[in-house]
Curated annotation (Swiss-Prot):
The modification Phosphoserine is found at S10, S277, S833, S861, S941, S1090, S1113. Residues 524-851 are annotated as: Interaction with NCOR1. Residues 835-847 have a biased composition (Acidic residues). Widely expressed. Highest levels in testis, lung and thymus. Expressed at relatively high levels throughout brain development. In adult mice, expression is high in neurogenic regions such as the subventricular zone, rostral migratory stream, olfactory bulb and dentate gyrus. Disruption phenotype: SIN3A knockdown causes a significant decrease in the amount of cortical progenitors in the proliferative zone at the peak of neurogenesis, and results in altered neuronal identity and aberrant corticocortical projections. SUMO1 sumoylated by TOPORS. Probably desumoylated by SENP2. The gene is Sin3a. This is Paired amphipathic helix protein Sin3a.
Length: 1274
């Protein structure tokens, strides 16, 4: 996982850059720095990145209040409102307990001129809070409705803000997380706190109330110590000694939520390990806070229930059209992504989607919905303007954010009272002596580009402006300069101390000593003498920024060599061995997984989330172990001091390691707690350990308890989040499978697939000048016939619930799935007498007329005894092997068969996976029983015993039936797709993705079936198959396929004529060795008639010569002379007979010919046809020629013996002659011995006999070998 540069070191070192809430001394005297920068700054992100990519951490727990609301109305609003306070020593997290720390007098604050605003929350906060309420009270819908009624009453001004707080507190009694979460939507000055005794404290402007079970009762409370502080601030605690300041309390684990919605902050981490990003949400919430609504007076934000009601209105309006709602979300998310890109680019990026385009797309989406469109316009006030970054600027002008989402005030441009610095000098402010007059509200907010540096510099002093100009020129990067200004912004907001500011800007100004010294003098900063003895860390960080590593020497892809001109930093602790073996030349440039161009190698969002959890867990562990190591060292010192006398204790001193082995570890542990005062604490430990060690040790142990308690809470959150995303992180294919599979299952994609294969064959044949190869274009397999029943059951289940399909069509579909398809696939037929549909399928008969009632204007369904798709010939082939079925289909039938095969294949894969898991489970239990001697139940696995996994409601043996039930529930809409996918992942892990689109697949199949039973051409295709099936032209055994070639050719011609306007596919279902193979071939049905006159003349001449048996073309004579296709002796006999007939006709002897023809029966009805496009001759079915002599069989029996002996004598005479010439007597004798098995060694013991027999009137020698019993050697 890609780590930040500052995270690659131990988190202990990062503590120097972070402000610890428990330490407040550093804020007692601080200056403000005014930079001549544009008045709009980008939100301060978690890390501030310089121009070269080096990033610097910002304190994660700081949260500075926004400008309070000046409106007279106080009530819940979508805004992240916190108390205005100049010393953010206490942070009130959402859902956490009150955090207290030292209180210090606040400097006077000048009144803010003009209308004041508070930061607006996104609509996700409201939606997530509603989702949490809905989840909490899932079994009590009335509570959720009452909450919405309270919000509506407040909107109508029926109740005030205290009334809302009282009613919400009573409604959510017993749920402190919901009550505390409601603080997010309260105006400034109001705060709700839940006590341990279930009492609710409500802080209102001026006093604090307690809400008992019956309402609000004012309770006397001490007045606030600081009038300038809003009363929502926690009561200050008495001041404590400086060496032991009070640290911020960490939220208790009971307040940590198992599933943190987007609207709630993750429980506040200590300053060591704050989660850097919210958890990945499976469903992105709706965000419609695109701009400031012009219809809301005084620039009020969009109200809580206004946004909720609008979103709910869209959901309800398009309840039957979920695609519109999804498209609406997609438009908003695309717009927000563009705005984020524009914000990150700093004004150098033009969004591809403007507000005008957003409004236009929503207008097209909400056509004829004027009320929704007009209401949406409230969220896009500048839809008709051309401001590039209106939304981004509006958010930036209001505030900048730290990494916890807290609101940080914008730098004020009005005069502030000057405060004396530590060295007595004063910091000059903007010119002017009084408050500036109110600024009139402009119709549009200025964009970032409209505010120039020159305008901003008018408010600065010449020396300061000159300094910032030098800094901008020295940094030579706009991004680095903006990061430098961000440091000043958060210092002006008193988020960081002066020392931390100097440390943050040192990477920018460290390599410019003159500017850096001027800046430190301007701040009045003096380095502490106690810290001079410690080595400076990262002193050469600025130097690394000047090196151009792209031009340096490379070693592989991960290392760069430092240039020779680079001056190595001095190191006094190196030995000669260190100088010999340590690397000072090569710098590591690793290749991160996120930088890969291959999508398959990148981590998914769920993997990234788990990696972040592990990073946070690691950082927290490092901090805890560092603190524990320091505790052990100090305990050892305390034990040693207890054995010393008072005089020895007074003389006892510690070195820089504080009694341990490392200077850095213990110093970082103390700096994490005492912050700026850590140097004094360390100095006290070294000089006076007898007094300082017990105090510091007590402090460390207290923090150890707090952090351990926080760790337990975080472990719960991390565990739940890991469980939520663990299975998704393993599934790499499921993320993109749904989107890609939807495209694959489209009818157009299936047709394009086979058409592209057909075109490739045609092009290949054209290039090679060869004939087009004949054969199937696709070959698909049906591996298991049992799956056909499950596929048919799912399809019929969905068909039953389709109101758009007529009852008669449903019955036809049922017959196709239970009878017709199994017959094609040589499978067992299904049962049509479904008990579930007995009453539904029965014909409703009118009692008066006795005629079947009509449904939707169509006659009742046919009786069950009538089978519309009877295929008796195919049924006979079911139990045979090496058989086939032939089916010529159109587009709809082809698409249906493709989808049906995909469905069966996926069901088989899920079924096979379930069987494998059953086998693994059985093997594991068998191994535990035999090897470990443990016999456990099915639901008693080690993971469940250790509470690492929740017990499943379904046994492994029931996974496949449970999967089928879930598919039915998904088709019926009883479960949503996310719940369905999560359940599948839990059962089948990474193999579940193949079934994510099962509902879409079945719906596509049902649509094709509806076409098959209702479309005229599809019905004719089916009828043609059934008719040809009766003629024996649709299949049979493979070894007799040639005998049916004429019938199949006729079937093909009829199918091509029927489907002349669309594709014609030849489907062959071949059963071999128990498996069924489906082959698909796209036929060419286009006839291309030749217009060449030469070809036409040759064709006419060919037909004429063929019809006349007297003449033959010269080409044919020449071809027959070279390669005759008949026996020449037959030709001689025919010619001899012809000459004999001609001679008899001349002599007038007609009696013999008539007598010869009397005993002969003949038929001459053979017909043929020619295909004009290919000149191919095709014989007509049931036309034939034959000739038969009545006495031919009798005469053959009578002459059989004579003919057989004559032929044998002729053959024997030829053999004897050849043997006499080529075979000597010795060879003939050897042959006789070999036949009798004599004179050969190594033969199995046997006896050979020779008997003479007569076969077909001829004597033959019959040799018989009889083997003896073979005894094997022991």
């Amino acid at each position: 996982m890609k780590r930040r540069l500052d995270d690659q070191e131990s988190p202990v070192y990062a503590a120097q850059q972070r402000r610890i809430p428990g330490s407040t001394e550093a804020f007692s005297h601080q200056h403000r720095v005014l930079a001549p920068a544009p008045p709009v700054y980008e939100a301060v992100s978690e890390t501030m990145q310089s121009a070269t990519g080096i990033q610097y951490s910002v304190a994660p727990n700081y949260q500075v209040s926004a400008v309070p609301q000046s409106s007279g109305s106080h009530g819940p609003a979508i805004a992240a409102v916190h108390s205005s306070h100049h010393h953010p020593t206490a942070v009130q997290p959402h859902g956490g307990q009150v955090v207290q720390s030292h209180a210090h007098p606040a400097p006077p604050v000048a009144p803010v001129q003009g209308q004041q605003q508070f930061q607006r929350l996104k609509v996700e906060d409201a939606l997530s809070y509603l989702d949490q309420v809905k989840l909490q009270f899932g079994s009590q819908p009335q509570v959720y409705n009452d909450f919405l009624d309270i919000m509506k009453e407040f909107k109508s001004q029926s109740i005030d803000t205290p009334g809302v707080i009282s009613r919400v507190s009573q409604l959510f009694k017993g749920h402190p997380d919901l009550i505390m979460g409601f603080n997010t939507f309260l105006p400034p000055g109001y705060k709700i706190e839940v006590q341990t005794n279930d009492m609710v404290n409500v802080t209102t402007p001026g006093q604090v109330h307690q809400i008992p079970t019956h309402g609000i009762q004012p309770q006397p409370q001490p007045p606030p110590q600081h009038p300038s502080q809003p009363s929502s601030q926690s009561a200050p605690t008495p001041a404590q000694p400086a060496p032991q300041p009070t640290a911020a309390k960490v939220s208790k684990p009971s307040q940590l939520q198992a599933h943190t919605p987007a609207s709630q902050q993750t429980p506040p981490l200590p300053p060591y390990a704050s989660p850097r990003s919210p958890p990945v949400q499976p469903h992105t919430p709706v965000t419609i806070s695109l701009g400031t609504a012009p219809s809301l007076q005084n620039n009020q934000p969009v109200e809580f229930n206004h946004a909720i009601n609008y979103v709910n209105k869209i959901k309800n309006r398009f309840q039957g059209q979920p695609d519109i709602y999804k498209a609406f979300l997609e438009i908003l998310h695309t717009y927000q992504k563009e705005q984020r890109n524009a914000k990150e680019a700093g004004g150098n990026y033009t969004p591809a989607l403007t507000e005008q385009e957003v409004y236009a797309q929503v207008a097209r989406l909400f056509k004829n919905q004027e009320d929704l469109l007009s209401e949406f316009g409230q969220f896009l006030p500048d839809a008709n303007s051309s401001v590039l970054l209106s939304k981004t600027t509006a958010e930036k002008v209001d505030s900048v954010r730290n990494d916890h989402g807290g609101t940080v005030k914008k730098p004020q441009l009005n005069n502030k009272p000057q405060r004396p610095s530590q060295n007595g000098c004063q910091i000059r402010r903007h010119s002017g002596t009084g408050a500036t007059p109110p600024v009139k509200k402009k119709p549009k907010l200025m964009s970032l580009k409209e505010s120039s540096m020159a305008d901003a510099s008018k408010h600065g002093v010449g020396t300061e402006s000159l300094f910032f100009d030098k800094v901008r020129k020295a940094l030579r990067s706009a991004e680095a300069y903006e990061n430098f200004l961000r440091c000043l912004v958060i210092f002006n907001q008193e988020v960081i101390s002066r020392a931390e500011l100097v440390q943050l800007v040192s990477p920018f100004l460290g390599k410019f000593p003159e500017l850096f010294n001027w800046f430190k003098n301007f701040l009045g900063y003096k380095e502490s003498v106690h810290l001079e003895s410690f080595p400076k860390e990262r002193a050469t960080e600025g130097i690394a920024m000047e090196i151009d590593y792209a031009s340096c020497k490379r070693l592989g892809s991960s290392y760069r060599a430092l240039p020779k001109s680079y001056q190595q930093p001095k190191c006094t602790g190196r030995t000669p061995l260190c100088k010999e073996v340590l690397n000072d030349t090569w710098v590591s440039f690793p290749s991160w997984s996120e930088d890969s161009t291959f999508v398959s190698s990148k981590k998914t969002q769920y993997e990234e989330h788990i990696y972040r959890c592990e990073d946070e867990r690691f950082e927290l562990d490092v901090v805890l172990e560092t603190n524990l190591a320091t505790i052990r060292v100090l305990e050892a010192i305390q034990k040693k001091l207890s054995r010393l006398s008072a005089e020895e204790q007074a003389k006892f001193r510690l070195d820089n390691t504080l009694g341990g082995t490392s200077e850095v570890i213990h110093r970082k542990a103390l700096q994490r707690i005492y912050a700026d005062k850590a140097a004094d604490i360390i100095d006290g430990l070294r000089k006076n350990p007898s007094i300082a060690v017990p105090i510091v040790l007590k402090r460390l142990k207290m923090k150890e308890e707090e952090w351990r308690e926080a760790q337990r809470g975080f472990n719960k959150v991390w565990r739940e989040q890991n469980e939520k995303y663990y299975l998704k992180s393993l599934d790499h294919q499921g993320i993109n499978f749904k989107q890609n599979d939807t495209k694959v299952l489209r009818s157009k994609s299936l047709l394009n697939e086979i058409e592209s294969i057909y075109d490739e064959r045609q092009e290949q044949a054209t290039e090679e000048n060869a004939g087009v190869p004949v054969g199937p274009h696709l070959s698909l397999a049906y591996e298991d016939k049992q799956i056909l029943e499950d596929a048919a059951a799912l399809i019929i289940h969905h068909v039953k619930r389709q109101t758009g399909i007529q009852k008669e069509d449903k019955y036809k579909i049922k017959q196709i799935m239970h009878h017709f398809i199994p017959d094609l696939l040589f499978a067992q037929r299904g049962d049509l007498s479904d008990v579930e549909e007995e009453e539904e399928e029965e014909m409703d008969v009118d009692e008066a007329t006795g005629a079947p009632k009509k449904h939707n204007g169509v006659g009742g369904s046919p009786p069950k005894s009538k089978l519309l798709f009877s295929n008796t010939a195919a049924q006979k082939l079911r139990g045979m092997d090496e058989v086939y079925n032939l089916f010529y289909v159109n587009n709809n039938w082809y698409i249906f068969m493709r989808l049906h095969q995909i469905l069966c294949l996926r069901l088989l894969r899920i079924c096979s996976q379930a069987e494998r898991q059953i086998e693994e489970e059985n093997r594991e239990r068998e191994w535990e029983r035999e090897v470990l001697g443990i016999k456990r139940d099915k639901s008693d696995s080690p993971a469940i015993q250790l509470r690492l996994k929740e017990p499943m409601d379904v046994d492994v043996e029931d996974y496949y039936p449970a999967f089928l039930d879930m598919v039915r529930s998904l088709l019926d809409g009883n479960i949503d797709s996310s719940q369905y996918e999560d359940s599948l992942r839990e059962m089948f892990t990474i193999h579940a993705y193949i079934a994510f689109t099962m509902d879409k697949l079945i719906q596509s199949i049902v649509r094709q079936l509806q076409h098959i039973v209702s479309d005229e051409v599809c019905v004719q295709v089916t009828d043609l198959y059934l008719a040809e099936n009766n003629n024996g032209a649709t299949g049979g055994q493979l070894n007799s396929q040639t005998s049916r070639s004429l019938l199949e050719s006729a079937y093909q011609r009829k199918a091509e004529q029927l489907m002349s306007d669309e594709n014609c596919f030849k489907l062959m279902f071949i059963q071999s060795q128990g498996q069924v193979q489906l082959t698909v071939e796209l036929l060419d049905t286009e006839e291309e008639n030749s217009d060449d006159p030469v070809e036409a003349e040759r064709w006419s001449d060919y037909v004429e010569r063929y019809m006349s048996s007297d003449t033959t073309s010269p080409e044919l004579r020449e071809h027959l002379a070279q390669k005759p296709v008949f026996l020449p002796r037959n030709l001689r006999r025919i010619r001899k007979c012809q000459r004999g007939r001609e001679q008899q006709e001349k002599e007038g002897k007609e009696g013999n010919s008539k007598k010869t023809m009397e005993n002969v029966e003949s038929l001459d009805k053979l017909e043929c046809r020619f295909k004009l496009n290919s000149y191919k001759m095709v014989y007509v079915i049931k036309s034939e020629d034959y000739m038969y002599r009545r006495t031919a069989l009798l005469r053959a029996h009578q002459s059989h013996e004579r003919v057989s002996k004559r032929l044998h004598q002729r053959f024997q005479a030829w053999v004897d002659k050849w043997t006499k010439e080529h075979v000597p007597r010795e060879m003939a004798a050897e042959t006789s011995k070999w036949l009798m098995g004599e004179g050969l060694e190594g033969l199995v013991p046997c006896t050979t006999t020779c008997d003479t027999e007569t076969l077909h009137f001829v004597s033959i020698n019959k040799y018989r070998v009889k083997y003896g019993t073979v005894f094997k050697a022991p």
